[in-house]
């Protein structure tokens, strides 16, 4: 029985290139990595975050002065995995330009906003959604209280960072992330999550 990721891997197209040494084949994502394009697709979780971080660090080592392009189509996911990607984006020398294709929700929206100012984009029919972090805990009452305190701290920290990236006042961010808040591409520009709607390349 094959799981969804096995099936998806089998469906990834291969690109064949002619070189001086003969033919070379790449999966499509590896070929795009040569153009400094990284795809962040699907749930944000630890394994995916490690791959994104590794690609960011590799591209920095290749050309520290050239922009990196991070294409995002994600429903969100783990805060800690997302913060690993975010911190690396801020840490490395190249500017990271973010582009929303499809959707950038929750942690996906946070990473979209965390791109280099002036280089954050949405495609015309993409959607962006911001909200507060989710938590579900079981166990002893004292442990639940500890986790509740932790998630409130994370919520406040994420709101502060989102306020910095969007230019919105903290109280506006706190109000707007209290529940799921969906935006069109143009609304995301108005809010400050991205800088422009990209309709054509160039």
From Swiss-Prot:
Pfam family, one: CLP_protease
Gene3D superfamilies cross-referenced by the UniProt entry: 2-enoyl-CoA Hydratase, Chain A, domain 1 (3.90.226.10)
Gene Ontology terms for molecular function: ATP-dependent peptidase activity; ATPase binding; serine-type endopeptidase activity
Keyword Lipid metabolism appears in the UniProt entry: no
Keyword Hydrolase attached: yes
EC number from the UniProt entry: 3.4.21.92
UniProt-annotated catalytic positions: 106, 131
Any one annotated GO CC term: cytoplasm
Record field: catalytic activity: Hydrolysis of proteins to small peptides in the presence of ATP and magnesium. alpha-casein is the usual test substrate. In the absence of ATP, only oligopeptides shorter than five residues are hydrolyzed (such as succinyl-Leu-Tyr-|-NHMec, and Leu-Tyr-Leu-|-Tyr-Trp, in which cleavage of the -Tyr-|-Leu- and -Tyr-|-Trp bonds also occurs)
Subcellular location: Cytoplasm
Database matches in InterPro entries: ClpP (IPR001907), ClpP/crotonase-like_dom_sf (IPR029045), ClpP/TepA (IPR023562), ClpP_His_AS (IPR033135), ClpP_Ser_AS (IPR018215)
Record's keyword terms, sorted: Cytoplasm, Hydrolase, Protease, Serine protease
Main location: cytoplasm
Protein's GO biological process: protein quality control for misfolded or incompletely synthesized proteins
Summary of subunit composition and partner proteins: Fourteen ClpP subunits assemble into 2 heptameric rings which stack back to back to give a disk-like structure with a central cavity, resembling the structure of eukaryotic proteasomes.
Family in the record: Belongs to the peptidase S14 family.
Summary of the function given for this chain in its UniProt record: Cleaves peptides in various proteins in a process that requires ATP hydrolysis. Has a chymotrypsin-like activity. Plays a major role in the degradation of misfolded proteins.
Classification via PANTHER family: ATP-DEPENDENT CLP PROTEASE PROTEOLYTIC SUBUNIT
Protein name as annotated: ATP-dependent Clp protease proteolytic subunit
């Amino acid at each position: 029985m094959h799981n969804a990721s096995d099936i998806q891997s089998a469906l990834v197209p291969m690109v064949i290139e002619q070189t001086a040494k003969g033919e070379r084949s790449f999966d499509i994502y590896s070929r795009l990595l040569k153009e400094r394009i990284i795809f962040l697709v699907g749930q944000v979780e630890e394994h995916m975050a490690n791959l994104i971080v590794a690609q960011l660090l590799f591209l920095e080592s290749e050309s520290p002065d050239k922009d990196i392009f991070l294409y995002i189509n994600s429903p969100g996911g783990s805060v800690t995995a997302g913060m690993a990607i975010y911190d690396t984006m801020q840490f490395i020398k190249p500017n990271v330009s973010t582009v929303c294709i499809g959707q950038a929700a929750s942690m996906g929206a946070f990473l979209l906003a965390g791109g280099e100012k002036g280089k954050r984009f949405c495609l015309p029919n993409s959607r962006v959604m911001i909200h507060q972090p989710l938590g579900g805990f079981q166990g002893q009452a004292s442990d639940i209280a500890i986790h509740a305190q932790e998630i409130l701290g994370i919520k406040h920290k994420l709101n502060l960072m989102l306020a910095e990236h969007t230019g919105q006042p903290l109280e506006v961010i706190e109000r707007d992330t209290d529940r799921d808040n969906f935006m069109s591409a143009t609304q995301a520009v108005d809010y400050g999550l991205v800088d422009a709607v990209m309709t054509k390349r160039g």
